[in-house]
From Swiss-Prot:
One Pfam family cited in the UniProt record for this chain: Lipocalin
Keyword Transport assigned: yes
InterPro entries recorded: Calycin, Fatty_acid-bd, ILBP, Lipocln_cytosolic_FA-bd_dom
MF terms (GO), sorted A to Z: lipid binding
Keyword tags: Lipid-binding, Transport
Top-level taxon of the source organism: Eukaryota
Family statement: Belongs to the calycin superfamily. Fatty-acid binding protein (FABP) family.
Protein name in UniProt: Fatty acid-binding protein type 3
Methyltransferase as UniProt keyword: no
CDD domains: FABP
Length: 132
């Protein structure tokens, strides 16, 4: 998991507005989210990872242990049940469940970049981050 530790700045986003629309996010929040370039910082202490996301909309901090479900309030205000899994040292998956839908986020680090693929139903977005 050391591959994730540090800060990552959003460089490019493809199709995120469509994903947010599928989640039922209103147009004003969607514009705020898609116009910002959030920075995500990962820290690791023992088997607990913390992910701090700073954006124009909100700053969120979540700490998690892989494989353990927990309640999360998302930056867009939804309450979801979230589980992270470690797929490899350079790939983690996140599943967010709520009554309306399920969101899958796969983050993969390769060559100094982090690619986050977000899928809700049949809609997919890809966010590219660079290490700062």
């Amino acid at each position: 998991m050391a591959n994730f530790v540090g800060s990552w700045k959003l460089e490019q986003s493809e199709n995120m507005d469509a994903v947010l629309q599928k989640l039922g996010i209103n147009v004003i929040k969607r514009k705020l989210i898609t116009s910002s370039k959030p920075e995500i910082t990962f820290t690791l202490e023992g088997n607990k990872m913390t992910m701090k996301t700073v954006s124009a909309l909100k700053t969120t901090v979540i700490s998690f242990t892989f494989g353990e479900e927990f309640k999360e309030e998302t930056a867009d205000g939804r309450t979801v049940m979230t589980t992270f899994t470690k797929d490899s040292d350079s790939k983690i998956s996140q599943v967010q469940k709520c009554p309306e839908n399920t969101t899958h986020v796969v983050r993969e680090v390769t060559g100094g970049k982090m690619i986050a693929t977000v899928t809700v139903g049949d809609v997919k977005a890809v966010n590219n981050y660079h290490k700062v």
